[in-house]
Amino acid sequence: MSRSIKKGPFIDDHLQKKVDQSLESGSRKVIKTWSRRSDISPEMVGLTFAVHNGKKFIPVFVSENMVGHKLGEFSPTRTYYGHSADKKGKR
């Protein structure tokens, strides 16, 4: 279920301040964040975020296709190793 249009997108205040500072200074430094719940706004296009996945920070370069999605969608938290192979030789 998506968020109500009248509420608008959610962006953590501390993350918004970091984005504003980065845009004012024109620096392309990586913005480190734990805020996986924040929406990606159009002003974030072209910036790189280091999004925490619970263990380490995953670099995420924001493109136009990502606008409207959450930052956490682009840093997976679970690793899938696949199912074990069939053990036909053991029969």
Curated annotation (Swiss-Prot):
GO terms for molecular function: rRNA binding; structural constituent of ribosome. It comes from the Bacteria. The keyword Transcription regulation does not apply. The keyword Ribonucleoprotein applies. One of its GO terms (cellular component) is cytoplasm. GO terms for biological process: ribosomal small subunit assembly; translation. Keywords: Ribonucleoprotein, Ribosomal protein, RNA-binding, rRNA-binding. Disulfide bonds: none annotated. Protein S19 forms a complex with S13 that binds strongly to the 16S ribosomal RNA. Belongs to the universal ribosomal protein uS19 family. This is Small ribosomal subunit protein uS19.
